[in-house]
Amino acid sequence: MDKKVTEVVEALAQPIVEELNLELVDVEYVKEGKDWFLRVFIDSETGVDIEECGAVSERLSEALDKEDPIPHLYFLDVSSPGAERPLKKEKDFEQAVGSQVAIKTYEPIDGEKMFEGKLLSYDGTTITLLLTIKTRKKEIQIPMDKVANARLAVTF
């Protein structure tokens, strides 16, 4: 992912989503096959609908055309983050306390790099998860600097 592109797009998108009383959740700029995709995820306390996604897409498209930070063709996709919303900001982790989450780490912790469990606490530097391994439960602490990515996890 091109960090510079996502930073420029975040800077362009932030005032647009704020003006519409929405939250900018994440920006992804990825190549899939031969095509480039710029994905912008928005949300609000009550969720977002297609009209809000369309309004952000239209305004952001105009801003991107004017600023022109991407040198080649790409597809712009504005949508909600879905049920398995990524956890990126402190606020995301704070709101997710008590929820099921999936965490991937840069390096193994207790021999594992993938964890799924209940987020018990978040203090800004450490995540505490309650893992269920077969019939027993285990608490694990994961330093934030070891977290590669985190998201809400849907369980059935």
From Swiss-Prot:
It comes from Bacillus cytotoxicus (strain DSM 22905 / CIP 110041 / 391-98 / NVH 391-98). InterPro entries: Ribosome_maturation_RimP, RimP_C, RimP_C_sf, RimP_N, RimP_N_sf. Required for maturation of 30S ribosomal subunits. Its main location: cytoplasm. Keywords: Cytoplasm, Ribosome biogenesis. The lineage of its organism: Bacteria, Bacillati, Bacillota, Bacilli, Bacillales. It holds the Pfam family DUF150_C. SUPFAM superfamilies: YhbC-like, C-terminal domain (SSF74942), YhbC-like, N-terminal domain (SSF75420). It is found in: Cytoplasm. One of its GO terms (cellular component) is cytosol. Belongs to the RimP family. This is Ribosome maturation factor RimP. The keyword rRNA processing does not apply. GO terms for biological process: ribosomal small subunit assembly; translation.
